[in-house]
């Protein structure tokens, strides 16, 4: 009964939980984890999905060492399905070969009307020196990482297109950068050249993965809020 009550007090839904992983439906506006600018004490008080889950697992016991471990991240303004590990070993299991062990699809509303019904972007991405933005750079650039984004059109309107995106790699801001550089930034993505909107129109729709204990394929989904 206690765990049920605590789930209701969370600001998001727990989609699945066992002794190895915990899968949530993250709302837009919630940080995945703390920012580097905060000290340790402040980081523990910062409102993040990670801290909320730590509190949930500890059930109010201040001396408890139960915690979650990062496996991947969603940008603060991106909503949808994401997973945390319940041990360092499970975290390392996924992070050692994330792209092979998982599959992710997103839904995005992008500015303008895309004429093609489907396509793919491929480039090498690199963070700027301050880490704030990411951009495509020539192959062979130091610290650049290859990124591939496959997409298909779901619907079109007068001023925007809704696309389903299949990530073939998981780089920082990958979807946002690739669509911005194509001339169709994600609606609301002011950081990458879009007009201001009520939110960033990017949602992690599904996450599938091989379970770390038995290899069984598991898949979780979240309805798009737009």
PLM-predicted stretches and their roles:
Residues 151:
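Long C-terminal interaction/binding lobes of large macromolecular proteins
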Residues 111, 165-168:
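A structural micro-motif recognizing beta-strand termini
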Residues 1-21, 30-33, 145, 158, ...:
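Pseudouridine synthases involved in rRNA/tRNA modification
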Residues 1-133, 138-148, 156-157:
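RNA pseudouridine synthases
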Residues 23, 74, 106, 134-138, ...:
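N-terminal hydrophobic or amphipathic segments with adjacent small-residue motifs
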């Amino acid at each position: 009964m206690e765990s049920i009550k605590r789930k209701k007090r969370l600001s998001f839904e727990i989609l699945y939980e066992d002794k190895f992983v915990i899968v949530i439906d993250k709302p837009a506006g919630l940080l995945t984890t703390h920012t580097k600018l905060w000290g340790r004490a402040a980081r523990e008080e910062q409102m993040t999905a990670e801290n909320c889950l730590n509190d949930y697992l500890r059930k109010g016991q201040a001396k408890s060492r139960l915690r979650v471990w990062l496996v991947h991240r969603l940008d603060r303004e991106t909503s949808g399905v994401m997973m945390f590990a319940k041990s360092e070993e499970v975290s390392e299991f996924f992070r050692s070969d994330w792209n092979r062990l998982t599959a992710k699809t997103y839904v995005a509303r992008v500015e303008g009307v895309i004429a093609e019904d489907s396509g793919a972007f491929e480039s090498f991405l690199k963070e700027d020196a301050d880490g704030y933005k990411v951009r495509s750079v020539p192959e062979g650039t130091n610290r650049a990482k290859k990124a591939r984004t496959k997409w298909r059109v779901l619907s079109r309107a007068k001023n925007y297109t809704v696309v389903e995106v299949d990530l073939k790699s998981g780089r920082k801001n990958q979807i946002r950068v690739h669509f911005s550089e194509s001339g169709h930034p994600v609606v609301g993505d002011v950081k990458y050249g879009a007009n201001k909107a009520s939110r960033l129109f990017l949602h992690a729709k599904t996450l599938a993965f091989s379970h770390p204990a038995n290899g069984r394929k598991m898949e979780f989904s979240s309805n798009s809020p737009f």
